[in-house]
């Protein structure tokens, strides 16, 4: 580098250091993209900009990557370490590749041809200041003079220097390019052309399409044939004028539609960055690269997160923005459309949806057309398939209405592929968890409003870590091609279609998404410590016992991970415990022997929420432990037989991903891991408890205790009264569960949750144990109940069977009275 250039760079660096605070995407490109700092790198930038180059240089030095401003020397040949693909805006609009970039690519390829051991990493990098997509209809022509471009860059750095990011892309091996494609100038030209297309797609993924002018969007919707027909039907059915019906339609559009604003997003990012840094100790994001790739490949993206808290809306948009992606349009419940939250959310991309569409054809038509328009324009969308926040910490059964509308949008004949992206959202503290516990115990849900929001803000402190894990995407076109090959026959650009395959397909996809969300779960200090303490009947463990139990969980999660997408803590058991104690949920009592970790009674109910977040990760090892403890010695084949009978119930409740064919192998692997940890012994082909580690095994087995008790309740009722109808079975199961929780101190509100028993009874029907004619397959029911009966304590079993007998007697008495009255009549 010449002396004058060094002086120029130093002078330019002074204002950049003050004005620019860029974010690197991904956060650790060395690890996430597989960059090798020890190998030379050719940085490829889209436009000739010294400000961009120096911004990149600062980040490269901070990451330990080669300096892009320093030349690369090899065998006496000196080449620049960076290349600009294009000079930037020109007098003429059409693209002319920068000849210097083509020559430099050719020089590098030629160097690889002459030196077989050389392998330079070509890394595309884009530096962006600001991400405003602009509005439709606004002409924003590119400047025609380089001087104007320089002035624009100056103001961009001045105004948007804090809203900038440096996006690294996956490296391309120039050794591979030279070997596979040759080294002539044609390949160099192709590299420049491909790089230009790459940057164009990357910018669209980061900025998104232009935003609509709201009134013009409404006018377009009103002109659609579907809404015109719905307006005519509204006027006719309600006996009102066409103008009045159209005003009703516009009012509904005003209620539904977002009013997205880049400036609002930028301002909220400042506020949220300040807020998260004070409330959270960190936001952990995993597998975001797969979503960035989808966006860059031109997919229409539908984000489908689990719903834990009202915080989800803000957290997900914040995370996506910081991953270099456009914040999505978010389907929010109409209950959040209150002042001042409603207008703010609307500017951040929220569009509002009512709880039910029944009886309002105009509303459902407008909502469906609006959603279809979002997809057609290329905006990403986010909705919560559970329909509401989970009160138990487990995933809720999916609501399929919005997903059905998504597929109907595809049936309008759009060319853009739509891909569903499941997202697991996890917290170490959910601010609404106290309210959830009250609602599960029967309290009326408090209506959202300004005062409730203020009270909620007062609870925002010491929130620990947050987790956002992107699951395995589900491309809808690929899915439909595989499962409904004839789906394209239903394409109609005018009318919304409801082909016969739509409902079952939507149901299958929704269940698949729930499974994929659980496949990307994040275990953390709070839910692991809660799991351990709630497993103890006294809700207390010594520090040594806590260490052993946490270590058991960690080894299971690391050695036999539930799925490749789950994340387990990298900290040690002691570090996790110290972190959890810092959350002020647990108490420490010291005595002459050591520390005792205590979960206070008032906190125990709340901690079940966090335990339930990851219950599916540990349910199978817990079940193995429970079976071995209660049988003392048992063959693996018998363990597999018993779990295979119970598994469909667990699978439906917890959205487990193992198939029946995979299950035996998984159980064998888990049993081997428990043996490796010396929790079990393997003798003479049988599994047995290892007495020195019995305490850890008992605590592990407790993770499935309440689940088995619930199943025993329902199956006991079926054994006692095989002809009981589904509604009565659910009701009696809940009543008995409430009784059991009082008599045996089961301090978990979800133990008698209506949704849990509804899912259980529905699964029994699906598996053929009960039929629509209210008949039970008695032999199979008794077999499963006997297995469950051996896995619960004698006291609990006695209570269940006593209550079931009473219920049977009441049912018999009621039937006799009915028969007698019929005879007398």
From Swiss-Prot:
GO CC annotations, alphabetized: plasma membrane
Disordered: annotated segments: 802-825
Membrane association type: Peripheral membrane protein
Domain of life, per lineage: Bacteria
Single Gene Ontology BP annotation: fatty acid metabolic process
SMART domains in the cross-refs: PlsC
Reaction catalysis annotation: sn-glycerol 3-phosphate + an acyl-CoA = a 1-acyl-sn-glycero-3-phosphate + CoA
Motif (HXXXXD motif): 306-311
Known EC number: 2.3.1.15
GO molecular function terms listed in the Swiss-Prot or TrEMBL record: glycerol-3-phosphate O-acyltransferase activity
Keywords: Acyltransferase, Cell inner membrane, Cell membrane, Lipid biosynthesis, Lipid metabolism, Membrane, Phospholipid biosynthesis, Phospholipid metabolism, Transferase
Protein's cellular compartments: Cell inner membrane
Pathway this chain belongs to: Phospholipid metabolism; CDP-diacylglycerol biosynthesis; CDP-diacylglycerol from sn-glycerol 3-phosphate: step 1/3
Homology family: Belongs to the GPAT/DAPAT family.
UniProt domain comment: The HXXXXD motif is essential for acyltransferase activity and may constitute the binding site for the phosphate moiety of the glycerol-3-phosphate.
Cited HAMAP family: Glyc3P_acyltrans (MF_00393)
Descriptive protein name: Glycerol-3-phosphate acyltransferase
Organism field: Pectobacterium atrosepticum (strain SCRI 1043 / ATCC BAA-672)
Gene: plsB
